C-alpha cells in the first residue's frame, strides 16, 4: 500500500458515512470506495427521482432516467468542483437527462406534488407549488390547493427550459442564483425564463380564480 494512503483511523466505516458531509463522501467515492457510492445514491435517489418524475410523468421512465443520472454522476465524479454544492451539480445532471429525453420524445407532462425532499403528506402540501411574486398580485393570491388540472396542463405545455426553472423556483424554493448554478445558465436568462413562464401560465391561473 502506498505510504500516502489514507490512515485506517481516518477511514470511516460504512455506518459512519451518513454523518459525513457530501464533499467528504465524494472524496471517498473517488478513492473507489463502493460504500461511498451507495451513500450518495441513498441520500439523493429519492429527490432525483421526484425531480425527474415531475418532468416526464411516467414512473417507470423516471426510474430509468434516475438510474441514467446516477451512472453519469458516479462516472464523472472527478469533474465535480468542491466549491459548489454537490446537490446542485447532481440536480443539473438529472435535469439535463430529463430535458434531453423530453426533447427526443417530445413529452410534455409534469407533476406538481411538492418538493422531492418532502417525506410526509404534510410536508408535500407545505412545499407544493405556489406561483407567487410580489410584483404579480394575481399569482400571489393563488394557493397550492387551487392549482388544479388547468395549471398542471399549462405547465406541461411550457418549453422544457421554462419548466425546469419554474419547478426549481416554486417547488424547490431555490433562489435565482441557485437555479442559474444548477442549470448552468446566466442569471439574466433564468429571470427571463421564469418571467416568460409566468406570463404563459397567467391565463390558466386567472381561469381558476373566482
Q: Locations of the language-model features?
A:
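Intrinsic, short, N-terminal disordered tails of RNA polymerase sigma-factor systems
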Residues: 1-27, 31, 39, 110-161, ...
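A short, charge-rich alpha-helical start-of-domain segment used by transcription regulators
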Residues: 26-49, 74
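Sigma70-family region 2
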Residues: 30-31, 57, 70-85, 104-106
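Amphipathic, Lys/Arg- and hydrophobic-enriched alpha-helical face
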Residues: 41-59, 76, 155, 200, ...
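Structural recognition of an alpha-helix C-terminal capping motif at a helix-to-coil junction
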Residues: 50, 64-71, 84-96
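Arg/Lys-rich amphipathic alpha helix in sigma70-family domain 2
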Residues: 78-82, 92-113, 144
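A short pre-motif secondary-structure segment
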Residues: 165-169
Amino acid at each position: 500500500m502506498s505510504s500516502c494512503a489514507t490512515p485506517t483511523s481516518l477511514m470511516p466505516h460504512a455506518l459512519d458515512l451518513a454523518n459525513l458531509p457530501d464533499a467528504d463522501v465524494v472524496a471517498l467515492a473517488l478513492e473507489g470506495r463502493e460504500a461511498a457510492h451507495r451513500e450518495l445514491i441513498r441520500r439523493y435517489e429519492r429527490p432525483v427521482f421526484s425531480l425527474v418524475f415531475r418532468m416526464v410523468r411516467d414512473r417507470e421512465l423516471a426510474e430509468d432516467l434516475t438510474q441514467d443520472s446516477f451512472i453519469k454522476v458516479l462516472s464523472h465524479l472527478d469533474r465535480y468542483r468542491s466549491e459548489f454544492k454537490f446537490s446542485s451539480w447532481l440536480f443539473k445532471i438529472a435535469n439535463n437527462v430529463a430535458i434531453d429525453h423530453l426533447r427526443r420524445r417530445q413529452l410534455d407532462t409534469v407533476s406538481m406534488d411538492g418538493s422531492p425532499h418532502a417525506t410526509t403528506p404534510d410536508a408535500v402540501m407545505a412545499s407544493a407549488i405556489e406561483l407567487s411574486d410580489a410584483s404579480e398580485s394575481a399569482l400571489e393570491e393563488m394557493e397550492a390547493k387551487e392549482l388544479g388540472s388547468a395549471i398542471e396542463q399549462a405547465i406541461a405545455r411550457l418549453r422544457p427550459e421554462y419548466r425546469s426553472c419554474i419547478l426549481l423556483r416554486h417547488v424547490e424554493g431555490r433562489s435565482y442564483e441557485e437555479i442559474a448554478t444548477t442549470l448552468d445558465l446566466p442569471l439574466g436568462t433564468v429571470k427571463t425564463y421564469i418571467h416568460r413562464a409566468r406570463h404563459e401560465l397567467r391565463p390558466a391561473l386567472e381561469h381558476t380564480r373566482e
